Amino acid sequence: MKIILWLSLFLFLVAGATPVFGVVEDLQIESVESVAEGRDFGRVGPYEKVVGRLTLSLDPETERIVDLNRAPQGSDGRVRFEADIYLLRPVHAERGRVTLFLEIPNRGGKAIVRYFNRGATRTFDPVTSESLGDGFLMEEGYTLAWIGWQFDVPDQNNLMKVDVVPATSGGRVEGLVRADHVFEEESDIFELGHVGHRAYLPTAIDDERHRLTVRSTRLGPGKLVPRESWSSRFPDEVTGEGLAVRLDGGFQKGKVYELVYASADPVVVGVGLAALRDGAAWLRDSEDSPVAVERVLAMGISQTGR
């Protein structure tokens, strides 16, 4: 089937015991509502949507998460953060499978319903009968889940995010950020936050470490673009959304442009992957879980499938 060619599908087994360094401390449910106007999905019956926020904590000495020991800690010495969670579950849990189907959100979105159910619309809130398509996953009784793990997705309704913690303890951290882009059409704007995502802000407009280069091929030699021929644009100095570079004469189609610039105050991005791991394990194992499942099946599309 063509649909399989578009997906990178994988199975993973979450460790049987609660992860040593990760704990889900709380689930704050924000809403529970019926989907598809109460449509019956065969023997399984109707589904409902659950939206909320997970509060998680980690041991700051977890070495696999870079800079976690630089994050602010609570009085008990643990690092806390929150992640979005979105569930589609059978109203009658006993009729469903004991399998949780977790999609690793690509850019905060939701796609498995559209692919597996042949949903007619692309949406971040798949609750209409049209968006749920032929209802395949529901008729099979799967509980569907999405957990936010990216910190840089745009601040839009129903995009899945994780509120990451800053690596600010012990003094300010500075370093270099690299962004590159190949333009399909000529343009005078180079957006650093791809498709509206958040980008790190530069330390200063005129920092001498900022460099823009251009090359004809991916592995070819780079040519330095004179500093006086390009400038920066800062629509939102708080979030970094809309951060861009303008180039006199514009960016050429097919060329590889690379910007390296100085920035500061990094966030601990790795907690997003911990949110996926610990959130999935908690949904499966905890007595406080809002779903009745015994195993987790996960998949990703595009970057999350790689």
Question: Which residues are covered by each model-predicted region?
Answer:
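Positively charged n-region of N-terminal signal peptides that target proteins for export
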Residues: 1-5
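Bacterial N-terminal signal peptides
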Residues: 6-16
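Sec/Tat signal peptide C-region and signal peptidase I cleavage site
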Residues: 18-22
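C-terminal His-loop and adjacent cap/lid subdomain of alpha/beta-hydrolase
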Residues: 23-306
